[in-house]
Amino acid sequence: MFIDHLIIGAGISGSYIAHQLNKKGQSFLVLEKDTIDRGKQYTINYTVDDQVVNIELGSSVIHSKQETILELLKELNLHTTPLPKNEKAVYIYPGYTFEKAKEKYKALRKKLKESASNYPSYFTVEDLAREIFDKLDYEFFKWCMDAWYEYNDQNAITYFDSVKNEGEYLYISEGMEYMLKKISLPFLDKIQFNTEVKSVEKSNEGYIVKTDKDIYNAKKLYICVNLRSAKKIEYIKLENVSRYLNLGLSKECLRVYVVLNKRLDIEYGSISGKFLSKWTLRITDKVWMVTYTDGILANKLENMEIKELIRTWIDDMNNLFNKDLTFNDVVYYVSGYWDDAYAVLSKEFYKGNKVKLPDNLMITSLPKGKGENTAWIEGHLYKI
């Protein structure tokens, strides 16, 4: 079967691309492995006490850059509600403020018998937990961090439930599930559900896509799946696709924890730097996490010294928040590639290391299978 435009994945990214093609009268087909009630952007499933728990995230591979979320909301006639000024301005749980997320988290813990023993080998993120949640176990921390990271991706269509418009944060009253269903209503007949992609190959005419039902030849291919689905298919061989997958499958995300000797009175938030896309999170008022993520600039990033990256971050902080930080204000910095799970540090960096972390730098625990005195395999601790 020959198709002009073939889209893999009917989540918000795939549906948005289909929406644009449909408006232009282009012929296309969308392949979706789930049923018509696919619902959310995508979910990660993990099991606790033989019970499967779904965690909602968003498509990580490819997003449209042609239209802003506000234009799309207007086009779909979706309602937005301003965020009250006394609320936190960052949404880490889709469509909810910190307080609402806290309620959802409590409900989740109750569903899981409110037992931390459900998460063996994981500890709480104490500093962050005291300011946001009563307790914050590793799995939920990973959930929040993933969601927050995805929702502040500078390259995305901004498929989040909250969006900033002229300094004011808005959220979609109907929720993302409603948005996803509404955007695909005009072309439901062009979405082939219950279809699993088995392989993708480059051909002289375009791409050959094999599914569990048929074989398709496409002139143009749009891969709009999450990273976990992408791992099951050999997309990595495709030109201009590997860089997106590498963002989650290789060492192109560098995370740096910066410990300062002074307090910074700045709220939590996402910071986009001049040099490359950076996601900054305040762990405490003296401890900051900076994630450098840009597959395109990966080679340049790897060739830069950590100190140079930190200086770039300091410049951005000073410019954005009118601060007077210098490199001399940095006491420690810890770096590592976003490589294995989402663990970062243990209380003692690794066995035999004589340099101790400051007491207020207890970020998270270790991934399963790692020793208690082991941190990131490729992490390094530097003392200035």
Where on the chain are the PLM-derived regions?
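Active-site substrate-recognition segment that forms the wall
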Residues: 243, 251-300
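Dinucleotide-binding Rossmann-like beta1-alpha1 core, especially the glycine-rich loop
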Residues: 50-119
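Glycine-rich FAD pyrophosphate-binding loop
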Residues: 22-48
